Regions:
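Gly/Ala-rich phosphate-binding loop of Rossmann-like dinucleotide-binding domains
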Residues: 61, 167, 271
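Conserved phosphate-binding/catalytic loop of the ribokinase/pfkB sugar-kinase fold
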Residues: 69-72, 98-103, 113-148, 153
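Conserved phosphate/ATP/ADP-binding segment of small-molecule kinases
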Residues: 160-244, 251
């Protein structure tokens, strides 16, 4: 990124290009999950856009960032009703969807999500695997206006060229490690930051201890690496030292899309010039507020709500966040 481009970026809200999976979510809220062959009545039902990239884009837009989305979808318009519904919802959230690629004859992914009164989830997803072979039409054009890229690893053939194009421009690339993969995944080398879910890190490395898992991944990439772990502390490596960042204590109502909200907040904060610890703390606040509300990505907070939350609950605690873990 040239000095002129950098100066222009500072004069406006950062623009984050989110790349990856796009889903239509149908969510059923029940008191208890049905037993085998049983039936239950849902007490709430809603339809919302889903998928890591799409959820993160909504979070970024609500926080005041410029949010663009790139990902393969079914098509064409008028025939793929799942995709049509998702794009209408994203347009209402001010997400730029011009780089969403529709694949004729296929259906956009769809999930049925069952959530009980304790916030536990069961998810069933239909996704036509032929969509995974889609590659971006022109990765350089897609990232031309992006100050940062946030990619999930659900469609590696689609996101890898986008990540590579962003790196050529000098833009940060945040990889959401959501799908278990191999330890030497080429996407790790294309990212400046890799943040895993605990499940993904354990399944990718085969190592139960999250700290040891991060150390294993660090052998394959020079990227900043971290792992979120639900209500427990975020772990990350700092110069090879394993450290922790406490998360906010939240009474969770709905965790759907919380990780995506965290990644969106983290990527936006990085693009705004925050360091990794500050960005993780900001992302943690975004995710925490989202968890306190029912609605999936529709529960993502705005900037004022996050700033008020941080003011009430404290900014990053250097002594605590930079203390080495005893392992």
């Amino acid at each position: 990124m040239s000095s002129t481009d950098a100066a222009a970026a500072r004069s406006r809200a950062p623009r984050i290009l989110c790349a990856g999976i796009i889903v239509l979510d149908e969510v059923f809220r029940v008191e208890e999950f049905p037993k085998a062959d049983g039936k239950v009545q849902a007490n709430k039902f809603f339809v919302v856009n889903g998928g890591c990239a799409a959820n993160a884009a909504v979070a970024i837009a609500r926080l005041g960032g410029g949010a663009a989305l790139a990902g393969p979808m079914g098509g064409p318009a008028g025939e793929d009703h799942n995709g049509d519904q998702v794009l209408r919802a994203l347009a209402r959230e001010n997400v730029d969807c011009r780089f969403c690629q529709r694949v004729d004859g296929l259906a956009t992914a769809k999930s049925a999500i069952f959530m009980n009164g304790r916030g536990d989830r069961t998810i069933v997803t239909y996704r036509d695997e032929r969509i995974a072979a889609t590659v971006p039409a022109d990765a350089d054009i897609i990232v031309a206006a992006a100050d940062a890229v946030l990619a999930d690893n659900r469609y590696p053939d689609f996101v890898a060229p986008i990540c590579a194009a962003a790196r050529r421009r000098g833009a940060p690339v945040v990889l959401d490690g959501d799908r278990p993969t191999v330890e030497d995944d080429p996407l790790f080398g294309l990212a400046t930051h890799v943040i895993f879910s605990s499940e993904c890190l354990r399944e990718t490395t085969g190592i139960a201890d999250l700290g040891d898992g991060l150390r294993r991944i660090a052998r394959a990439t020079a990227a900043f690496v971290a792992v979120s772990n639900g209500p427990d502390d975020i772990l990350y490596l700092d110069g090879g030292m394993l450290r922790r960042l406490p998360v906010f204590a939240i009474s969770a109502v709905d965790t759907l899309g919380a990780g995506d909200a965290f990644h969106g907040g983290f990527a936006l904060a990085l693009a705004e010039g925050k360091d990794e610890v500050e960005a993780m703390r900001f992302g943690s606040a975004v995710a925490g507020i989202k968890c306190s509300r029912l609605g999936g990505s529709a529960g993502a907070p705005n900037r004022r709500e996050v700033e008020e939350f941080l003011a009430e609950n404290g900014l990053p605690r250097a002594a605590q966040s930079n203390a080495a873990l005893q392992t």
